Amino acid sequence: MIFPVLPFLVGSIVLSANTQNATEKNSTSASATESATTEKTSSSTDNKAPEQSKEPPHDPEGVKPPEGFQWKIWAKEPLVADPVAFTVLNDGSLMVVESERQDRGVEDNRYSPWWLMEDLRARTVEDRLAIYTKWASKRVNGMDWYTKYADRVKHVTDTKSGGVADTAVNFSGDLREPLDGTAAGVLQVGDSVFVTCIPNLWRFQDKDGDGVAEVREKMFTGFGVKTSLRGHDMHGLVLGMDGRLYWSIGDRGYNVRTKEGAVLQDAARGAVFRCELDGSNLEVVFRGLRNPQELAFNDLGDLFTVDNNSDGGDKARIEYLPDGGDVGWEMHYQTLEGANKRGPWDQEHEWFMFDPTDVVQPAWLTPPVAHLTDGPSGLVAYPGVGFPEKYNGAMFVCDFLGGDAYSQIWSFKLEPKGAGYEMKDAEVFLREVLPTDVDFGTDGCMWVTDWFDGWTSDGTGRLYRVWQPESFEKSKAAGGADILKKGFRGADTSDLLAWLDHADRRVRQGAHLELAARGGAAIDSLVALTHNFQTPERARLHGLWALGVVARKFGGTTTGDKACDELMQLAADPDSELKAQATRALGDSRCAKALDLLRAMTLDENPRARAYACAALGRLQDKEAIANLTAVLWENDNADPWLRQAATTALARIGDRAKLEVMAADQFPQVRLGALLALRQMRDPAIGRLLFDSEATIALEAARAIYDLNIESQMPMLAALGDRFCDH
């Protein structure tokens, strides 16, 4: 029987590599995280919940912000109840997602153990519906159980300018089909409101202005093939600097057909998706997540999430999400207990921080940036206005633990380190609140949704505003709220260019996306701005991002060529960050005439530029770059896991098996490992040749790949590998 071979080999190979010190690291992590570390009820109840308050609902005695900040209740039940997520519109009103289906329509395998094995086998949403139908007798009123309650999106407004909400309208209509839920993400872009509610990504539009959507379009369907744990749903809708829509899903998996006819499928892993606003070019950009809640871009246009722990002694993780990365979680790990608790997730240190001396942690995964929170939920990047300067560059994450006495909102900063990031300045920002989501209004105030109590839907909820008076006045003086309310479509080009240096990142982003949409009418102005060294760096950066959008959307035209030419100029800029960003944009826009430049950029002294160059060459499938990528692997020598990931993902996308086999025989182990990691992404049986590598860690990595991917042709060789470590 082959099944027990890999765990045995892991232990044997690790011992042969003398890894005692590596396996002892983080030895205190389990005891530090075995206490209640739970996800928000509207998203999950992964851990044992504290007892729900038996007292009637009451207003909190006081949310506790930092000294000098103020707060107020803006809305409460019945206007807002069971709030999961929200977005602040440019006119100052809110779209709030409510979920009344928690544990009464949105289910959880832990409380429905009878269908666990079937759920593990499910591959499509139709499979899940068949499971619900088969076991309908377990529910009160059978299948009606799944349609009695609804999730929805409410448009909540202060129509009387009284400083509190006074009106709430059911904007989306009820979402109550058996496969639905949790509705957990909402974002307005233009006249469209996008909503994530498994199994669908929705687009809603209110054409007649009555506050209710007449257009209800399922852009995509097929998300959430499994039940998994309650709350491991679709979240995190956010607009990228590239003008594309991004969102996340937990380990309920997906089986989705794109507009172009391709099928994206992974039944047991969470992921991050992106597509154009019209739904074209849907793709997976990151894999292997467990329960990522919201997504947030920082001021450099890099993407992050905070992913929850599994109650197995592991910790919640801040994850940097580079294109093609993989965290390593699989849904069935949650079911493993006893001596094999959480399987390789814990035993092979998959959730650990990167340590170059730890030969146990797999090289194929993308490690976390930091461990923070116990129940991560809503996430937002500070837009640059409304708070004191100490929060510039900060992110805020909700830490939901089932009661306001032990929940909070954290602030933290992320700074580039090598090709990745490191966390700085983590501190609790807001206490005495049970937060599900956090965002910033156009006026600079922070908004927070409060589930209020417990884990299940009970018809209560709050919406708070938090602000610092002096900084709030400065935010008003900056005028960003007026700009955002008026919109960008009718603005003069000169104003748009000036706004690229606005204090509010949302204004800068809106301006650069509008300039990009104008294409040829704005290209010369963008080139002049980015080419001028006297232009402030952040204005040049947003101008560069606009050029990247133009190069992508107008490729093959004179306008697109102009944008590509300027990006090539910027890739030689003395500003190291602009150089790195231009490199990324060239690959993202598939600018083929930049290939020579991109190959040269793999030697750049800035590791961010090197990583982006690798990613670009992979996107362009440049076979001539294999030597450059090999050099990156050799020089890096496994020191920077994010740079290694960029190079190996590029090699996999290029997909030249013959050259990878040559690399697999290279004299340098870091090159052989890089070839193996690329072959793993390709699911190529050629991995088998590395099972007997002289480096035990490479042999282990090959064994993992064959076992994890079930490469049947190599299973006999994997079994034979036991002879290398068995005593006879």
What residue spans do the PLM features occupy?
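Buried hydrophobic core positions in alpha-solenoid tandem helical repeats
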Residues: 219, 495-497, 525-530, 566-568, ...
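Secondary-structure transition/capping motifs at alpha-helix termini
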Residues: 161-163, 208-212, 275-280, 385-389, ...
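Alpha-helix capping and helix-loop boundary segments enriched in small/acidic/polar residues
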Residues: 225-228, 259-263, 280-283, 367-370, ...
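Sec-dependent N-terminal signal peptides
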Residues: 1-20
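Active-site proximal loops enriched in glycine and acidic residues that flank catalytic Cys/His/Asp
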Residues: 307-308, 322, 368, 383, ...
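Beta-propeller domains with acidic blade repeats across secreted/periplasmic ectodomains
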Residues: 34-495, 516
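Structural detector for internal amphipathic alpha-helices that build alpha-solenoid repeat scaffolds
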Residues: 478-487, 506-519, 538-558, 565-572, ...
